[in-house]
Amino acid sequence: MAAAAAARAVPVSSGFRGLRRTLPLVVILGATGTGKSTLALQLGQRLGGEIVSADSMQVYEGLDIITNKVSAQEQKMCQHHMISFVDPLVTSYTVVDFRNKATALIEDIFARDKIPIVVGGTNYYIESLLWKVLITTKPQEMGTGKVVDRKVELEKEDGHELHKRLSQVDPEMAAKLHPHDKRKVARSLQVFEETGISHSEFLHRQHAEEGGGPLGGPLRFPNPCILWLHADQAVLDERLDKRVDDMLAAGLLEELRGFHRRYNLKNISENSQDYQHGIFQSIGFKEFHEYLTTEGKCTPETSNQLLKKGIEALKQVTKRYARKQNRWVKNRFLSRPGPSVPPVYGLEVSDVSKWEESVLEPALNIVQSFIQGHKPTAMPVKMAYNESENKRSYHMCDLCDRIIIGDREWAAHLKSKSHLHQLKKRRRLDLDAVSATGSQSNSPDCDPERIEGESSGQHNQELKASV
């Protein structure tokens, strides 16, 4: 294969900061259902590369259908890594564990003069490989020698109490996190407890590194080639509905039943099932929970209704997840602030009948340009970063008794029906109070029209200050 030979035989020349030119780290982004695995396999075969999966659920053994793993036959066509190697009962596998193993694999692939192709839908896993953004903490051990994930332990506590403790040890980070965001609050507390250094201080140090930016440290590998597969939302929604139907036809229910019998029955009998950690957070478990736990214990009609309910829920949550993935790409890749932001090349995948000319050939041309040290002829996707917008600003709405994090969210809240309803209610109360005292005073301070105007003016000022 000429392409594979070209990929391995990269000549030495001046390149990134005077270093030898390096092979690219190919990264394929995209929502579920866009064909990321297909493109990765095609590029891997043509370029002699190896595929590194970046999917937080595919690391676990089992549930091959619901986690949409590539088949055993496809894995034989091109070397795949980071699939089916964690015991399903492990609930403490983290992005740090993933990063440590995956970066070592990538460095080994580079050392063998091959191209690593990172592909998957867990975008924060991909971020951990592209940028130096994670903080490594030391796991704690119990007296029995059992390793304990402190973050998981903290998440069992009350969210407001956790946030109060974080405010005492790291007020800067606490001001950026909502008390309901228990995972992030617990993570920040874990960092402080296990290192003695506040989470915000760690982030300041990362930002101060050469190449660092507001979202973390510098690039980990010097020559990333990022491809983003995207499709028309209506087309993708239809495709995802069909994917669920195909998964059902492939044996999804039997896979869930078997896994449920082996791993989850004991937890359910003890009322300790956990759909927040490990493989049990896979899309599909929660949606079919009621169907699986009542199967054989209710009438066929009821069971069939629960099955239909689970199928519809699975389709809806899959489509919501695809939207979330695209938002992450736009916010964390396309409009990422800072100096170490590589270009992202978009590939339109709405019409699969034109895959060869619209996706595969352009992708090959882009990667080959990186291999040869040339700038691709394709134009990268760009989105402007709004420097004035603070996504972690703290706002307290006394009217609604709510904490809002982020300028955009605050502006949206001020325009929301719930806030406007509370504002209207407050105005009525103010006017009623004025009317009650009106007979006792003719002071202009008690003029209802003036109070109404001031209330409207105050709300308008809030909007102007927040938009």
Swiss-Prot record:
<feature type="zinc finger region" description="Matrin-type">
    <location>
        <begin position="395"/>
        <end position="425"/>
    </location>
</feature>
<dbReference type="InterPro" id="IPR039657">
    <property type="entry name" value="Dimethylallyltransferase"/>
</dbReference>
<dbReference type="GO" id="GO:0005634">
    <property type="term" value="C:nucleus"/>
</dbReference>
<dbReference type="GO" id="GO:0070900">
    <property type="term" value="P:mitochondrial tRNA modification"/>
</dbReference>
<feature type="binding site">
    <location>
        <begin position="32"/>
        <end position="37"/>
    </location>
    <ligand>
        <name>dimethylallyl diphosphate</name>
    </ligand>
</feature>
<feature type="site" description="Interaction with substrate tRNA">
    <location>
        <position position="122"/>
    </location>
</feature>
<dbReference type="InterPro" id="IPR027417">
    <property type="entry name" value="P-loop_NTPase"/>
</dbReference>
<protein>
    <recommendedName>
        <fullName>tRNA dimethylallyltransferase</fullName>
        <ecNumber>2.5.1.75</ecNumber>
    </recommendedName>
</protein>
<dbReference type="Pfam" id="PF12171">
    <property type="entry name" value="zf-C2H2_jaz"/>
</dbReference>
<keyword id="KW-0862">Zinc</keyword>
<dbReference type="GO" id="GO:0006400">
    <property type="term" value="P:tRNA modification"/>
</dbReference>
<dbReference type="GO" id="GO:0052381">
    <property type="term" value="F:tRNA dimethylallyltransferase activity"/>
</dbReference>
<keyword id="KW-0479">Metal-binding</keyword>
<keyword id="KW-0547">Nucleotide-binding</keyword>
<feature type="region of interest" description="Core aggregation region">
    <location>
        <begin position="221"/>
        <end position="230"/>
    </location>
</feature>
<dbReference type="GO" id="GO:0008270">
    <property type="term" value="F:zinc ion binding"/>
</dbReference>
<feature type="site" description="Interaction with substrate tRNA">
    <location>
        <position position="206"/>
    </location>
</feature>
<feature type="modified residue" description="Phosphoserine">
    <location>
        <position position="455"/>
    </location>
</feature>
<keyword id="KW-0808">Transferase</keyword>
<feature type="modified residue" description="Phosphoserine">
    <location>
        <position position="443"/>
    </location>
</feature>
<feature type="region of interest" description="Interaction with substrate tRNA">
    <location>
        <begin position="281"/>
        <end position="283"/>
    </location>
</feature>
<dbReference type="InterPro" id="IPR036236">
    <property type="entry name" value="Znf_C2H2_sf"/>
</dbReference>
<feature type="region of interest" description="Disordered">
    <location>
        <begin position="432"/>
        <end position="467"/>
    </location>
</feature>
<keyword id="KW-0067">ATP-binding</keyword>
<keyword id="KW-0809">Transit peptide</keyword>
<dbReference type="GO" id="GO:0005739">
    <property type="term" value="C:mitochondrion"/>
</dbReference>
<feature type="region of interest" description="Interaction with substrate tRNA">
    <location>
        <begin position="183"/>
        <end position="187"/>
    </location>
</feature>
<comment type="similarity">
    <text>Belongs to the IPP transferase family.</text>
</comment>
<dbReference type="Pfam" id="PF01715">
    <property type="entry name" value="IPPT"/>
</dbReference>
<dbReference type="InterPro" id="IPR018022">
    <property type="entry name" value="IPT"/>
</dbReference>
<keyword id="KW-0863">Zinc-finger</keyword>
<keyword id="KW-0597">Phosphoprotein</keyword>
<dbReference type="InterPro" id="IPR030666">
    <property type="entry name" value="IPP_transferase_euk"/>
</dbReference>
<keyword id="KW-0539">Nucleus</keyword>
<dbReference type="InterPro" id="IPR022755">
    <property type="entry name" value="Znf_C2H2_jaz"/>
</dbReference>
<feature type="region of interest" description="Interaction with isopentenylpyrophosphate transferase">
    <location>
        <begin position="233"/>
        <end position="255"/>
    </location>
</feature>
<comment type="function">
    <text>Catalyzes the transfer of a dimethylallyl group onto the adenine at position 37 of both cytosolic and mitochondrial tRNAs, leading to the formation of N6-(dimethylallyl)adenosine (i6A37). Mediates modification of a limited subset of tRNAs: tRNA(Ser)(AGA), tRNA(Ser)(CGA), tRNA(Ser)(UGA), as well as partial modification of the selenocysteine tRNA(Ser)(UCA). TRIT1 is therefore required for selenoprotein expression.</text>
</comment>
<keyword id="KW-0496">Mitochondrion</keyword>
<dbReference type="GO" id="GO:0005524">
    <property type="term" value="F:ATP binding"/>
</dbReference>
<feature type="region of interest" description="Interaction with substrate tRNA">
    <location>
        <begin position="55"/>
        <end position="58"/>
    </location>
</feature>
<keyword id="KW-0963">Cytoplasm</keyword>
<keyword id="KW-0819">tRNA processing</keyword>
